[in-house]
C-alpha cells in the first residue's frame, strides 16, 4: 500500500506534486499563498455551486433570487457571505502571492510566471462577471461602464460592445451570458492552475536567498503540508469572522438597491480589489489611452522578467531595490484609495502622479537600480 502512491498512474501524479515533491528547506510563510489560492478556488467553486442551485439569471428575478437565498434557503445567507467575502480573500492572497514573486525574483521562471499573469487576468474577469449577477445598482452600472470601455477599440469598438451586450444596452441577454461565463471561468482557472503547477515542478520552487537549493531539499509532506494547514486554518478563520461579523464591510451599499437603468449612482466604482486599476484608467483623460493603461497595468507584469538586470535573483541582499519594492506597495495603496474617490481636485493629480510612478517603477527605476547595484558590487 505504501508504494501504491508511487506506482498507480493517477496517484503517482498527486504524489509527485503533494507528497514526495522535493522542496527547498528554507522557504518562508510567503510560499504559503499558492496553496491558499488553491483553497480559495475550491471554496469559491463549492459555495458558488450551491448559490447557482438557487439563483435565476433573469433581470426580473435575479435580485429577488439573491434575497431569497439569504432569507429562505438553509444557511443561504452564510453561503452567500462566504462567497462574496471569499472573493476578497482570493484577491488578498493573489496580491501577496504576486508581491512574493516580485520580491524574491520568482518571475525568472518565465513559463510559470506568464501563466500566473494569465491566471490573474482570468480571475479578474471571473470576479467582474460575478459582480454583475446580483443585479443591484452597482452591478448594472459597473457592467455598463466597464463593457463600454471596449467601444474605445478602433473601427470595431461599437459592434464589439453590442456583441457582448447581446443588444443595445446591458439587459437580460447580458446577465444570462455573464452567469454562463461566471460558472465556466473557475474551471478554466482550475485547468490553468494545473499548468501553472506543471511548469513550477519542472524547475522546483525558488527560495528566500535566490540560490540553487538542490543540495538542501526536503519532502513536501509532512513538513510543508502541515505548514500549509496552519495557513488554511488562519485564512478560513479570518474568512469566517468576516462573513459572520462584518459581511457587508467590503461591499457597496448601492448594490442593495435593485438595478435601475434610469438612475445613475453618484459614484460608480468597482470592488476594492480593482480600485488600483480603475484609478490608472481614470488618470488618463483619453478613452483609448485609459483602456490601454488599464490593460498595461496588469500586462506590465509580463515584462518584469525581461527587464531583470541584477546579477542577484531576489531582493534579500539588495537594499536599494527593496526600497523601490516598498514604494511600489505604497503606490498600490495610494492608487486603491484614489480609485474610490470622486474625480475632483486634488484626487485627479494624485492619481496621475501615482500612475506615472507605478509604470516608472516597473519599466525604468527597477532595471536601472538593479544595474547600478551590479556596478556598486563590482560585478
UniProtKB/Swiss-Prot annotation:
The gene is mt-cyb. It is a multi-pass membrane protein. This is Cytochrome b. The lineage of its organism: Eukaryota, Metazoa, Chordata, Craniata, Vertebrata. It comes from Anguilla anguilla. Its cofactor is heme b. The cytochrome bc1 complex contains 3 respiratory subunits (MT-CYB, CYC1 and UQCRFS1), 2 core proteins (UQCRC1 and UQCRC2) and probably 6 low-molecular weight proteins. GO terms for biological process: mitochondrial electron transport, ubiquinol to cytochrome c. It is found in: Mitochondrion inner membrane. GO terms for molecular function: metal ion binding; ubiquinol-cytochrome-c reductase activity.
Amino acid at each position: 500500500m505504501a508504494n501504491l502512491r508511487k506506482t498507480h498512474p493517477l496517484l503517482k501524479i498527486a504524489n509527485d506534486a503533494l507528497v514526495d515533491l522535493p522542496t527547498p528547506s528554507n522557504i518562508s510563510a510567503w510560499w504559503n499563498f499558492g496553496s491558499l489560492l488553491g483553497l480559495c478556488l475550491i471554496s469559491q467553486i463549492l459555495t458558488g455551486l450551491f448559490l447557482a442551485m438557487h439563483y435565476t439569471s433573469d433581470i426580473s428575478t435575479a435580485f429577488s433570487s439573491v434575497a431569497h437565498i439569504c432569507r429562505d434557503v438553509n444557511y443561504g445567507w452564510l453561503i452567500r457571505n462566504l462567497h462574496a467575502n471569499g472573493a476578497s480573500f482570493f484577491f488578498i492572497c493573489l496580491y501577496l502571492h504576486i508581491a512574493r514573486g516580485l520580491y524574491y525574483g520568482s518571475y525568472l521562471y518565465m513559463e510559470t510566471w506568464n501563466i500566473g499573469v494569465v491566471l490573474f487576468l482570468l480571475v479578474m474577469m471571473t470576479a467582474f462577471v460575478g459582480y454583475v449577477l446580483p443585479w443591484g445598482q452597482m452591478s448594472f452600472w459597473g457592467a455598463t461602464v466597464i463593457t463600454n470601455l471596449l467601444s474605445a477599440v478602433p473601427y470595431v469598438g461599437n459592434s464589439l460592445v453590442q456583441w457582448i451586450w447581446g443588444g443595445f444596452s446591458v439587459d437580460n441577454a447580458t446577465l444570462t451570458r455573464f452567469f454562463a461565463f461566471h460558472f465556466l471561468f473557475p474551471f478554466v482557472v482550475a485547468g490553468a492552475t494545473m499548468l501553472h503547477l506543471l511548469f513550477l515542478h519542472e524547475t522546483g520552487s525558488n527560495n528566500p536567498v535566490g540560490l540553487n537549493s538542490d543540495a538542501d531539499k526536503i519532502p513536501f509532506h509532512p513538513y510543508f503540508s502541515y505548514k500549509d494547514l496552519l495557513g488554511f486554518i488562519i485564512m478560513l478563520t479570518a474568512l469566517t469572522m468576516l462573513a459572520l461579523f462584518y459581511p457587508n464591510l467590503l461591499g457597496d451599499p448601492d448594490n442593495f438597491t435593485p438595478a435601475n437603468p434610469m438612475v445613475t449612482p453618484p459614484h460608480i466604482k468597482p470592488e476594492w480589489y480593482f480600485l488600483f486599476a480603475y484609478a490608472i484608467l481614470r488618470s488618463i483623460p483619453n478613452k483609448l489611452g485609459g483602456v490601454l493603461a488599464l490593460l498595461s497595468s496588469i500586462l506590465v507584469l509580463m515584462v518584469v522578467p525581461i527587464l531583470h538586470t541584477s546579477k542577484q535573483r531576489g531582493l534579500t541582499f539588495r537594499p536599494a531595490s527593496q526600497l523601490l519594492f516598498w514604494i511600489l506597495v505604497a503606490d498600490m495603496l495610494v492608487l486603491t484609495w484614489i480609485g474610490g474617490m470622486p474625480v475632483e481636485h486634488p484626487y485627479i493629480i494624485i492619481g496621475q502622479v501615482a500612475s506615472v510612478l507605478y509604470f516608472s517603477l516597473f519599466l525604468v527605476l527597477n532595471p536601472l537600480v538593479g544595474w547600478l547595484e551590479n556596478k556598486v558590487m563590482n560585478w
